[in-house]
Regions:
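Residue-level detector of solvent-exposed, low-hydrophobicity positions
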Residues: 8, 107, 123, 167-169, ...
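Gly/Ser/Thr/Ala-enriched C-terminal appendages of enzymes
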Residues: 91, 95, 99-142, 146, ...
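Beta/coil-rich, acidic/histidine-enriched accessory regions frequently appended to metallopeptidases
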Residues: 133-188
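Generic structural signal of hydrophobic/aromatic residues within well-ordered alpha-helices
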Residues: 71, 76, 80, 119, ...
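Catalytic cores of extracellular degradative/oxidative enzymes
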Residues: 1-108, 113-119
């Protein structure tokens, strides 16, 4: 945001009553998303934090697309990194939902209220994380999330296209090869 935008967004009454907190929360989310910021979701994984801010101030709880969009992507066997079928476009409105669905289940429903703090800690403690190819990071996320949850979350992540083999170049903030193989899926 430019300095002139601060007057529009920063007065507390406007942030809360007019739902203007999404933009600042989205930008601050970029500071916290490191462990879940992989190619194809740079502009959506940070919205876990935006959705949380909306929840905390009592506003609507998600800006994400309806889950019927997810069902369509699954029906068409699209991998998570390329739900739109265009390697230059991120499906931000549905991508943000995966992180929020996990929060709703584990935190809001009280299943495991330390799920995200523990998951982020485990991801942060992997000092090699940023050097791991993006497809491997995706599968590591599945493994770590399942470990922290003490549940096999493979079916959940399969619905979200994590368990769909893919080998393509994604053009988002640079060019990155995104590879998830059947062998990687089987290992997870």
């Amino acid at each position: 945001f430019g300095i002139n935008a601060l007057d529009e967004f920063m007065p507390t009454e406007k942030l809360y009553t007019e739902r203007r907190c999404w933009g600042p929360a989205h930008e601050i989310g970029h500071l916290h998303q490191g462990a879940i910021a992989w190619t194809g979701c740079f502009e959506s994984s940070n919205n876990l934090f935006s959705n949380y801010v909306l929840y905390k101030i009592g506003r609507e709880c998600s800006n994400g697309a309806p889950l019927s969009v997810l069902a369509d992507r699954k029906l068409n066997n699209r991998p998570f990194c390329n739900f739109l079928g265009d390697p230059k476009k991120e499906d931000t409105e549905i991508h943000m939902r995966i992180y929020w669905q996990l929060w709703l289940y584990f935190h809001r429903c009280g299943i495991k209220s330390d799920f995200y703090p523990e998951l982020f800690k485990k991801l942060r403690n992997n000092r090699n994380l940023n050097n791991i190819p993006v497809g491997e990071r995706q599968m590591l996320f599945v493994k770590y999330a399942s470990d922290i949850a003490q549940k096999n979350l493979a079916d959940f992540f399969d619905m979200w296209g994590f368990m769909t083999p893919v080998d393509e170049t994604i053009e988002q903030y640079g060019s990155n090869r995104y590879t998830v193989t059947n062998a990687m899926i089987a290992e997870t």
